[in-house]
Every structure is written in C-alpha cells, then in structure tokens.
Amino acid sequence: MKETDNLQQKIVSLCKRRGFVYPGSEIYGGLANTYDYGPLGVLMMRNIQNLWWENFITKRSDIYGLDTAVFMSPDVWVASGHTTSFNEVLIDCKNCKQRTGAEKLIEAFFESKDEKFSAEGRSLDEMEEIVQSNKIPCPECGKTDWTKPRKFSNLFETQIGIVPENKSLNYLRGELAQGMFVNFKNVLDSQRPKLPFGLGQIGKVFRNEITKGNFVFRTLEFTLMEFEYFFNPNVQKWEDIFEYWRKEMFDWITSMGVPKEKLRWRVHSDEERAHYSKRTEDLDFEFAVGFKEMFGLAYRTDFDLNKHIEKSGADLRYMDPETGEKFVPHVIEPTFGSSRIFLALLTNGYKEEGDRVVLKLDKKVAPYRVAVFPLVKNKEDIV
C-alpha cells in the first residue's frame, strides 16, 4: 500500500470514529459519492464558511451577499451553455459493465506508473487511442475491453409537477454563478452599486459525476463559496483584478495554518478551460493523493451576462453614473470548495505522536476551542 493511500485511509477512519464524516445511507449499504457530516464535522464546516463570509462579504463594502434558489428556469442552463457543454466523458468495461470517467481512468493509470499525464480537454478519439494503445485495465476486473468514450451531462435532471403528463424538465443547479448572473439587474435596481462590485453566496451544487475513492474531495453534492466580481474592462485591466484576487485567495487559506509549500497555482490549458472562461487558474493543495484543485479563479469576461441578455431579452447592462454610458461588465470569479478546504485542513493537521493520533487545527476552524476532561486514572492517554 502506498504511504499516500495509507494516510487517506487513516483520515477517513478518523473522520468516522470521531464524528467528522460518515458514509451516506450507511445502514442501507451506502450510496457512492455521498457523505454526511457528523457533530464535529458540522462545527468545523460552519467555522470555515463563517470565516469565508466574514472575510469576503461582511468586511467588504463592495461585495453583496445573495442566497439564490437551487431550482431555476431551465432556460438559464440553456442560455449559459451548460446543457451542451457541461459534460463528462465516460467509458464502460464490456466485461464487468463498470462505468468509469475516462479522464480519471487515464490519469490514474499513468499516476500508478509515477508519470504525470493530463487527460483533460482531450478529444474522444484521443482518449480512445490512449486507452487502447496503453492497454489500460479496468480497475474492477482487470480486463482491457472497453467501449468507445461517450459524453454524458453533469447536470442532474429532474421533473417538476404533480400530474405526470404535465411534468416539466428541470435541473438541480450545477454551479452557483448563474443564480447571481440572473439577479444582476435586481441588485443594480435595489442597491445602486458602483463598479467594481461583487455578488457572493454560499450554497449547495449538484454534479452527476462518476467518481470513486476520493472521499469528500469529489461528491454528487457539495457546498461552494463563490462570488462574481464585476468591473469595467475599459477602466481596469482584467489582469490586475485577477492578480488581486489570486493573492487574496492565497492569503486567506494560509491564514488558517496551511503551509505555502503545500500550495501551488496551476494554469488551465486551452483544451481544459471551461467554455465560459478566457483564463482559469486552480490553487492546488497537496492532498494525501497528491496535488489536486482546492480553489478556482476564472476570468468569465462578459460571456454569461451576454448569453442571458440574448436568451431572456432583459437589459443586463450597467450604466456609468458619470458618463451615462451603458455596457456589459466583465467578471472575475473566485470559487472556494468548502469540503475541499475541510479535507485540506484535516490532511495538513493529521499527526501521529507515538500511538496517539493528534489533529492540529487552527483555533479559528477547530470544532472545539476549549475542552474540559475528567481525570480518569485508567485512561493513560487522558491522564
């Protein structure tokens, strides 16, 4: 067993044993990629989210908080491009019928050979060639007989309505951003903000992804903390704002005790970048399984607002109060995954001192800041 795998298993065991995280629906055999947060996990997650809200919303006069609905008009997702571009490439083993994410399958194969390889952004034909030429085995049965890679939507579909024949298609939101974009005009009309300003929120999102063995790193539902920062591209350079938030994100996570040497920025390639982004960078943390994304920072330009103007017919332009000029602002988007911060802090804080397991957490995020224990003579680890 690799040392990294061993550390991951120790963290998973600690989380269940001490009431941080439990497997979802465990008494019924569980449901893959779902987890429930226990008493200590809830306290720690609340601390993380409260710290984020205080730092990026409460203490600032230029960012306004929102709490938008999980369900929105399906036209929102059509306009944003998610119904056509928010996909995952999957591949099936013909022998055992196991369905696997093609990108993750390829990357895990090369990682097992201690080779770095990114499959993101590869075409379906390229991924098929990589799987076949390397004879990549199925992680379940070991066979190398695969179907062709195919694209599947990451949006969870659902039906709204009581009468079966009148039910209509809808989606669970796949990101927080669209709820903020469609409320842009409401905030302009009610708050009269001046550029640059942001709209931020904390909320659950849902992604129909095929994952396995990643604990809370990648799940079917998770909580994001995110804001859209609007600015006039004719007045401010996007590079300057991008760099500003890049530093703010880095400084915030290191303020919670995460060492700088366990963090690195990684730029998305043109093939990897999302359909709405001109530039995306991930702040990676060195998890037990290696460096993986913890935060994301994207320059979404005016893509989303323009798409919603085109689809809805609403006027989502900003009018400069001094010049009277109307224009569509550009957007920089910092995104924070609370469950990944949670896992990063546990990974960084996990220590073994002899036979004792110690979790060294910054007091700002620790579930308990002070604990009083009785003196029990037969409990040497306490006495």
For the regions a language model picked out, list residue spans one by one.
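NTP/phosphate- and nucleic-acid-binding module
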Residues: 1-383
